[in-house]
Design a protein with these regions (language model features):
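C-terminal polymerase-core module
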Residues: 472-479, 483-534, 702-750, 754-756, ...
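Function-dense linear segments that define catalytic or interfacial modules
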Residues: 360, 366, 374, 378-407, ...
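Extended two-metal-dependent nuclease catalytic cores across DNA- and RNA-processing enzymes
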Residues: 22-23, 73-249
């Protein structure tokens, strides 16, 4: 038998701290529950164990605490946000049929050791899943540790232990007895680190062997003195660090076979936690709708009916598991073919859909506009809870308590679809967000469908040539790196790069973290003054990213018509921003000369020209309006340079005396204030001391008290209401503000400050897209809206329509709302995106 034992506490902590704080719309924390399930599902898929045990620590002291008062004394308590999730997670695991085990006075590690020994004695093998290296001492021919790291799970068998540490797995206990363990407050021998401990145990075999050979010349005098003076601590540490294999628990591996559990209860709980995708991953689709009462009559089963020749009234539309659309009216279910469905989309009927964008695209491809579409349940669910992990009919029905009106094998969700859409509509009305759906999100779905259909032409030959030049440059960069280091290695490997920089070249800092040397961008930037190879490495990363993500990505995405057809997503960003994928056109780089060249390969079609309109400083204009600051408003009304004007106001100097350095500082603060940046972040942006940045910030807030007051009011309002709103009424819940964790709470405060501004900017560009798209159609132009990126719209137009399109873009974008500060746009024209922008 193959038994998998999970170190529950280790993995749930990794899940909690590895995923941003998530909550349900009623404020329950869920990130640890969500992350733990993903870890478990991935382990099950990868290793397919016969039985699974999940081991937990008890909150009571253990025999180790009795032996040593200081054991784990330096650890902080469990965060309240995690503690609230633990009973829910354990209930869910029980409903899913997993056997959980814990024992007062013993640790989860001892349960892992006991079950591994018992399984081996029974002739089986054991997989121990943990993020804690303590369990590596248990590795043998029948026991493998699946060590969870930030990026991957690494199988550690005896050979892997020997390769990494140069000793046998049980000898890791001896190593810990010498070096100690700060995380568990195991003392070890003061002054003996990991490197020395490994060398001594490798030489003498064990802790006892070290002391038996204390006078050996291999033991340096300083080490000898430390070892001799601290023998008692070494022995204590050996006891504390040894995982026991005799915990009084059930040791028959068969006792940990997965149980039937309660699938319906699991599905209900997952739905209540708004983990819709996990309902599917656990295979619980059949049990998610609320169970009818015991006395309820059995559901009537209906078969699909022929669609009436002239459909009238309201229909509800969604896709079944095969991707086929079905319609529901009363207790009638219809499965129309594509042509019939397209005809209905522009008929006199009324259609309430769940995910309208594909239907809009179908209508557009058939020469219509989808005029029958009046509601989108998926978009409604997103507006009600933009933080949800997914939006599926069956899960939302369970979440909102919608019971099936009938059963239909061809469309299992058909019985709840109408009730769900009606319930979501009522909830949307109650929240005051129905106007957002009717006038912004639903019309925008049509616009996005059209943009997906049209696509954006690319110069594939130019991209290939650009890729070839990047590869050539990369070869030269790698040669420069290898020459400086003195040997070739995998520059993409953080481990090998760290060894090259810090061990071979001796660059500071020499400090390691748990995964080895840090080689992230921030670390490399700090090393620039020490060796020119750092510039080459940073350049390598830039070129490699351009090549793999953008050059190869765009060429792979090119369709037969020579265009890339991105998919635009409305239900992903919590701020209301649109995102795109396959390919992601929102992140085409523009900040570097090399990256911006990519825009030169997005081209207008034959006989066409690109017209690009970009809002000018839209977020600062919203800030000026929303705070009511007279100086900022006047600067925009006068068409002044807002950053120069701000600087002059702060320092009481004429604008013509503002230096570039002072203007840069004010610009950083103008934008940084919206993102909740403090002195430390500003100091990094400006390359100045923290104290100087703090002075800039305080002077700014003293000069613009209405800005300071607005930011404080945002936080107070969000704490009181539990959410923030854009000027259009879009809501975003902020449970982070109630967190006991300072960093999480500070993050919530930053979101409270910037969401109304960022979210309002997102709403404005969305509404502008709807207006521009409709205006182009109303004026019967051939011009087509191709793309939205942040505050920028790109239209493809025939040469003879350029002036008209420029006028439409300016009129619609600048007049989409009327605030105390005017919105302005900059419009450009060109054959490529680079030329037009």
């Amino acid at each position: 038998m193959k038994l998998m034992v999970l170190d529950g506490n280790s993995l749930v902590n990794r899940a909690f701290f590895g995923i941003k704080l998530l909550t349900t719309k009623d404020g329950r924390y869920t990130n640890a529950i969500y992350g733990f399930q993903n870890i478990l599902l991935n382990l099950l898929a990868a290793h397919k164990p016969d039985a699974v045990a999940i081991a937990w620590d008890e909150r009571a002291p253990t025999f180790r605490h009795t032996a040593y008062d200081g054991y784990k004394a330096t650890r902080h308590g469990m965060p309240e946000e995690l503690a609230q999730q633990m009973p829910v997670l354990k209930e869910l695991l029980t409903d899913l049929g997993f056997v959980q085990v814990s024992k007062a006075g013993w640790e989860a590690d001892d349960i892992l050791g006991t079950l591994a020994a018992a399984c081996e004695a029974a002739g089986g093998t054991t997989l121990l899943a943990t993020g804690d290296r303590d369990s590596l001492q248990l590795v043998d021919d029948a026991t493998t540790v699946l060590l969870a790291t930030n990026k991957e799970t690494i199988p550690m068998d005896p050979a892997a232990i020997r390769e990494k540490y140069g000793i046998e797995p049980p000898q890791l206990i001896d190593v810990k007895s010498l070096m100690g363990d700060a995380s568990d407050n195991i003392p070890g021998v003061p002054g003996i680190g990991e490197k020395t401990a490994l060398a001594l145990i490798s030489k003498f075999g064990s802790l006892q062997g070290v002391y038996d050979n204390i006078d050996d010349k291999a033991v340096k005098p300083g080490q000898r003195a430390k070892l001799t003076a601290n023998r008692d601590k070494a022995d204590l540490s050996y006891m504390l660090g040894t995982i026991r294999k005799d915990a009084p628990i059930e040791t028959d591996p068969a006792a940990y076979l997965r149980q039937p559990g309660d699938p319906a209860a699991a599905a209900q709980l997952l739905a209540a936690l708004e983990m819709h995708k996990l309902v599917d991953r656990w295979g619980l689709n059949g049990g998610t709708a609320p169970a009818p009462s015991e006395n309820a009559a059995p559901l009537e089963t209906v078969e699909p009916s022929p669609l009436p020749l002239l459909p009238e009234g309201r229909f509800y539309a969604a896709r079944n598991a095969d991707g086929d659309w079905y319609l529901v009216q009363g207790q009638d279910v219809y499965l129309p073919d594509t042509d019939r469905l397209a005809a209905i989309l522009d008929s006199g009927a009324e259609l309430w859909a769940f995910d309208a964008k594909p239907l809009y695209r179908l209508a557009l491809e058939h020469g219509g506009i989808g005029s029958a579409l009046r509601f989108d349940g998926k978009l409604a669910a997103y507006l009600l809870n933009p933080s949800a992990s997914g939006y599926e009919v069956h899960s939302l029905a369970a979440e909102y308590g919608v019971h099936a009106a009938f059963a239909c094998e061809a469309a299992p969700d058909a019985g709840v679809l109408a009730g769900l859409c009606d319930t979501l509509a009522a909830a949307l009305d109650e929240s005051g967000q129905r106007k957002l759906l009717d006038e912004m999100e639903l019309p925008l779905a049509r616009v996005l469908a059209d943009m997906e259909r049209i696509g954006f032409a690319i110069d594939a030959d130019g991209i290939r040539a650009f890729g070839d030049s990047l590869r050539s440059e990369l070869d030269g960069i790698l040669n420069n790196i290898y020459t400086t280091v003195g040997y070739s290695f995998n520059v993409n490997s953080p481990k090998q790069l760290g060894e090259a920089l810090f061990d071979k070249l001796g660059l500071p800092p020499r400090k390691k973290n748990a995964r080895g040397y840090s080689t992230d961008a921030e670390t490399l930037e700090s090393l620039r003054p020490y060796n020119q190879v750092i510039d080459e490495i940073l350049k390598y990363r830039t070129y490699a990213k351009l090549l793999s993500t953008y050059v190869d990505g765009l060429l792979n995405a090119e369709a037969a018509d020579g265009r890339v057809h991105s998919t635009f997503i409305q239900t992903e960003a919590r701020t209301g921003r649109i995102s795109s994928t396959e390919p992601n056109l929102q992140n085409i780089p523009i900040r570097t000369e090399l990256g911006s060249r990519l825009r030169g390969y997005f081209v207008a079609g034959a006989g066409e020209t690109l017209v690009d309109a970009d809002y000018s400083q839209i977020e600062l204009r919203i800030l000026a309006h929303i705070t009511g600051d007279e100086h900022m408003q006047q600067a925009f009304l006068n068409g002044a340079d807002i950053h120069r004007s701000t600087t002059a106001k702060i320092y009481h100097i004429p604008e013509n005396e503002v230096t570039p350095q002072l203007r840069s500082a004010s610009k950083a603060i103008n934008f940084g204030i919206m993102y909740g940046k403090g002195a430390y972040s500003l100091s990094k942006d400006l390359g100045i001391p923290v104290k100087e940045a703090d002075t800039f910030l305080k002077t700014y807030l003293d000069t613009f008290p209405k800005v300071d007051g607005y930011m404080k009011d945002c936080i107070a309002h969000a704490k009181d209401k539990g959410y923030v709103e854009t000027l259009f009424g879009r809501r975003r819940a902020l449970p982070e503000l109630a967190s006991s964790n300072f960093q999480v709470r500070a993050s919530g405060e930053r979101m409270a400050r910037n969401t109304p501004i960022q979210g309002t900017a997102a709403d404005i560009i969305k509404l502008a897209m709807v207006h521009v798209w409709q205006r182009l159609r109303d004026e019967k132009l051939q011009a087509r809206l191709l793309l939205q990126v942040h505050d920028e719209l790109i239209v493809e137009a025939p040469e003879e329509e350029i002036d008209e399109v420029k006028r439409i873009l300016k009129e619609e974008m600048e007049n989409v709302v009327h605030y105390s500060v005017p919105l302005t746009t900059e419009v450009g024209v060109g054959k490529t995106w680079l030329e037009a922008h």
